[in-house]
Regions:
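Short, structured segments at the rim of ligand-binding sites
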Residues: 1-409
Length: 409
């Protein structure tokens, strides 16, 4: 789907959709719990649907209605047959579920599309293979995992995706003995691990932090839970930046006491308004990079984004696509080994950009359009369905002028 956006400032109230990060975690924990859990305020998307279908494949019963889900925890796992899980393009689903399936002893075949087959899982092939798991894996998808995961010591580098740590934190409490996750270097993306630990606690699972990582007691029991998913600061970031560029949007459904790392967007915007620039370590907030680059493009001085090298293996090479987004519209962005250098120009203009299938590039482009003088065309705008299917509906309700010009995909 290709769209045309005519520049206009946004104004009004938007109810920020539920956190995708928290929804993934609550759905998985509910599926592992004894009894019935009810989770409200879910923002359904392709990624969330992938996790729901994954847990169904492992034996959970999940019933969805509008923004709610009723989950009956896994009672009988399909151990006598191979389960097939389609992760679509969701890296969270893939990396969260691999350890869970192996902890349950379910032989599982994983499928995926887009760039997901190229996203690495070598941490698991190395560490899980030491603990009873066999991988039939040739650096692509589909692939199969089999065996029964055993407790023990898991050594994980801190500069890899926190999704690997989260996956282990889900799985290890199910095992018969205690386990240790030993971080062999500084843990990046720590806020995402904090979200995991916070959600696990709601379901009765206790994770003990140690000097070197985490101690996980075995034979713990997930308890059923009823609650709502809080709003997503990573999605809110687009509207916060739109405000910084001159819009007047009131944001609802956000928890000011949230442990979400992307809440840092507020602090960075304040710094930019005070100083005219920012220098952002994005090791803990990688999802903010595209919209931060948009913010920096309209600053007064050069801004830098660093410690973001993992963005090269997202839905797109997000460092490249972010730079292309801004440079194609008159900006000045240079790619470094681990981030971006953004120099403001007075030459920002309309034009045409490609989404490269990346939902965050589409939304960053839509925010950028509010500060341009000419129309912006976004090719492949349907990518927003990955995380925020109603983004353009909300955008229009706020006064955005968006028209579909082609349904090509």
């Amino acid at each position: 789907m290709n769209i045309k956006i005519n520049p206009t400032k946004l104004k009004g109230y938007v109810n920020i959709p539920a956190s995708k990060s928290i929804a993934h975690r609550m759905l998985i924990c509910s599926a592992l719990a004894n009894g019935k859990s009810i989770i409200g305020n879910i923002n359904y998307s392709k990624d969330i649907d992938a996790t729901i279908n994954a847990m169904k494949a492992l034996g959970a019963e999940i019933f969805t209605d509008k923004n709610n889900a009723e989950i009956n925890g896994i009672v009988h796992t399909p151990k006598n047959k191979k389960s097939v899980i389609d992760c679509n393009e969701s890296g969270s689903t893939l990396r969260f579920i691999i350890p869970v399936a192996t902890a349950l002893g379910v032989k599982t075949e994983f499928h995926g599309r887009g760039r997901l087959p190229q996203r690495p899982i070598d941490i698991y092939t190395r560490e899980l293979s030491k603990h009873g798991i066999t991988f039939d894996y040739n650096n692509t998808m589909p692939f199969t995992v089999s065996g029964q995961l055993s407790n023990g010591i898991y050594e994980i580098e801190g500069n890899v995706s926190s999704q690997f740590i989260t996956g282990l934190l889900f799985a290890l409490p199910l095992l018969n003995g205690d386990s240790e996750i030993v971080m062999t270097s500084h843990l990046e993306s720590r806020p995402y691990v904090d979200i995991t630990i916070d959600v696990l606690k709601k379901f009765g699972i206790i994770i003990e932090e140690t000097k070197k990582g985490f101690h996980v007691k075995g034979s713990q029991t997930y308890k059923a839970y009823r609650g709502n998913v809080e709003g997503d600061f990573s999605q809110a970031s687009f509207f916060y930046v739109a405000n910084a560029l001159g819009s007047s949007i009131t944001l609802g459904n956000l928890n000011t006491n949230s442990v979400q790392g992307d809440k840092k967007i507020i602090e960075i915007i304040n710094q930019t308004e005070q100083n005219g620039f920012f220098n952002a370590d994005c090791s803990d907030i990688p999802d903010l990079v595209p919209v931060l680059a948009v913010l920096a493009s309209f600053g007064k001085k050069t801004s830098t984004i660093y410690n973001a090298e993992r963005l090269k293996i997202k839905e797109s090479n997000r460092l490249e696509t972010t730079a292309e987004l801004i440079n194609n519209l008159g900006g000045d962005v240079k790619i470094t080994d681990d981030g971006l250098i953004i120099r403001p120009t007075n030459n920002m203009h309309g034009g045409t950009i490609e989404s490269s299938g990346d939902h965050r590039i589409v939304m960053a482009g839509a925010v950028m359009a509010t500060a341009l003088k000419e129309e912006l065309i976004i090719n492949g705008a349907e990518a927003v369905t990955k995380s925020y299917p109603d983004f353009f509906e909300d955008y229009k309700k706020l006064g955005g002028n968006v028209n579909v010009i082609s349904m090509e995909q």
